[in-house]
Amino acid sequence: MMGRSPGFAMQHIVGVPHVLVRRGLLGRDLFMTRTLCSPGPSQPGEKRPEEVALGLHHRLPALGRALGHSIQQRATSTAKTWWDRYEEFVGLNEVREAQGKVTEAEKVFMVARGLVREAREDLEVHQAKLKEVRDRLDRVSREDSQYLELATLEHRMLQEEKRLRTAYLRAEDSEREKFSLFSAAVRESHEKERTRAERTKNWSLIGSVLGALIGVAGSTYVNRVRLQELKALLLEAQKGPVSLQEAIREQASSYSRQQRDLHNLMVDLRGLVHAAGPGQDSGSQAGSPPTRDRDVDVLSAALKEQLSHSRQVHSCLEGLREQLDGLEKTCSQMAGVVQLVKSAAHPGLVEPADGAMPSFLLEQGSMILALSDTEQRLEAQVNRNTIYSTLVTCVTFVATLPVLYMLFKAS
């Protein structure tokens, strides 16, 4: 490599970067290295739709469980929040706190009672020992050497008895104090419970009164709406035959006018036919046939149009007559029903019908009068029911006011 003629020599060794050797003019070698970077890891290709769908299918159960868990936690927290608000509104929290205080006071009182029991037992045991010492002291003569020892022991035991008695009295005082605190906690708990019961009763009473008022208002509104619907129905039933008769009269007048126009047209046509006679000259005879043909065509077209229009009017009149017959039957049936209602309401004023229904024999005037009478009676009945409901509501509210005042004053 050193004997090559080019001025550059390349040396490549496995694991070693390329080294570029350049021989200078003065015989010195200049080394230059070139670092080759290895290519990075090839990026993975895009996933296929099947793999994406499979991964989504595997993730769906976990997502569903997480979503269900979050929804459950949210629902639980919401329900707990509303339940806490309800308990705070009703007063259950105060009652629960008072019951907790009662429990704590009871525990303290039981501890104080145990201390009193122990102090009493210790005092009784010490008094028994002191009695034994006194008995021995009574049996020993004062000249004996044990007398001084027994007297000293008695003196010590008397001091111990005094201390135990003081402790017993203090334990009793503590027991009385704890018992008074326990009694106060019990009274407070009972007071809170009674207040909660009174509050619940008052709110239930207020809710009942409001519910009754809302029910009366709703029934009044429903009765008023029904009365308005009944009025509209009766007015429609009353105005129906009149409007139909007016339509029939208008159609009949238009039909008579069309018949009159048709008759005038026929008269004009006959006049034109008779006017075209043999007294005219040849020139006029030569020029008249096209004119007469045009006049005849125009008149025949007008005649056909009038005939078709008259047929349409006739068919409309037939349809209106059928509708009028059906409406008359319906009105007669309604009149019969009204007659039956009147006979049921006033049995002494209306004679009983023998055999068939007399509804087809009633006239339109009597039917309208019967409908008006029924409307007036129904309106009077609905107004009477509304007045009664209002009076009952007012009386109930007036009777409830003193009770509410007394309850709120007591609470």
Swiss-Prot record:
GO molecular function, a single term: mitochondrial ATP-gated potassium channel activity
Subcellular location: Mitochondrion inner membrane
Lineage: Eukaryota, Metazoa, Chordata, Craniata, Vertebrata
Catalysed transformations (reactions): K(+)(in) = K(+)(out)
Region Disordered, residue ranges: 274-294
TM stretches of this protein: 202-222, 387-407
Topology of the protein relative to the lipid bilayer: Multi-pass membrane protein
Residues in compartment: Mitochondrial matrix: 36-201, 408-411
Expression tissues: Isoform 1: Widely expressed. Isoform 2: Expression is barely detectable.
Subunit details: The mitochondrial potassium channel (mitoK(ATP)) is composed of 4 subunits of CCDC51/MITOK and 4 subunits of ABCB8/MITOSUR.
Annotated organism of origin: Homo sapiens (Human)
UniProt name for this protein: Mitochondrial potassium channel
S-S pairs: none
Biological-process GO terms, alphabetical: cell volume homeostasis; mitochondrial potassium ion transmembrane transport; potassium ion transmembrane transport
Lineage top rank: taxon: Eukaryota
UniProt keyword annotations, A-Z: Coiled coil, Ion channel, Ion transport, Membrane, Mitochondrion, Mitochondrion inner membrane, Phosphoprotein, Potassium, Potassium channel, Potassium transport, Transit peptide, Transmembrane, Transmembrane helix, Transport
Keyword Mitochondrion: yes
Role noted for this protein: Pore-forming subunit of the mitochondrial ATP-gated potassium channel (mitoK(ATP)). Together with ATP-binding subunit ABCB8/MITOSUR of the mitoK(ATP) channel, mediates ATP-dependent K(+) currents across the mitochondrial inner membrane. An increase in ATP intracellular levels closes the channel, inhibiting K(+) transport, whereas a decrease in ATP levels enhances K(+) uptake in the mitochondrial matrix. May contribute to the homeostatic control of cellular metabolism under stress conditions by regulating the mitochondrial matrix volume.
Presequence range in chain numbering: 1-35
Topological domain spans for side Mitochondrial intermembrane: 223-386
Gene Ontology cellular component list: mitochondrial ATP-gated potassium channel complex; mitochondrial inner membrane; mitochondrion
